[in-house]
């Protein structure tokens, strides 16, 4: 924005700590598995459990599907890198190159936030990147529960290369395998084969044993 329009005193730039973006056509494939016409989708539904994370909630003509991110096959496939866009794996803005005034994101360790007296159900992380961002933050910080991040593992979690093999959400090898399976079997079977292959193998052994 600044490269195109220049600097304005009232222009305040915010970006996000991003874990990557899923391919839209995979989401369309997933929605086709839902029974009934989909009326509403909420990726950040409130969990019934106090210490739990957000819920993935879909409202359709036939009822409400409510699952944790670990239970739902779409969000779990996203977390395991299977359905991310290829461009996410070469994104330079995932490292320590943030040109915004402030960067926002979900803080991944609610228990650690509680230990630091940040007593909210869904804590956020805020990175102040510029002098202008500091001025804005100083004007609002008295209305927030704040604790400085001092541990190296927490900082490294948010500033890292998406090309790192095996890092959460950025495993290109897993994505490439899923793409090949998707061509063979379609979305549903490819997801189950990649997320639950160990369980499938175990059930197949039981089935053979019972024959």
Question: For the regions a protein language model found, what residue spans apply to each?
Answer:
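Short, well-ordered amphipathic alpha-helices
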Residues: 1-2, 28
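A short alpha->loop->secondary-structure connector
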Residues: 3-16
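Active-site adenylate/phosphate-handling loop in enzymes that bind or generate adenylated species
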Residues: 16-17, 110
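Short beta->alpha junction loops/turns
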Residues: 19-20, 129
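Short, charged, surface-exposed secondary-structure boundary motifs
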Residues: 20-30
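Oxidoreductase and adenylate-handling cofactor-binding alpha/beta cores
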Residues: 33
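Long, compositionally biased charged/polar accessory segments in the mid-to-C-terminal portions
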Residues: 36-211
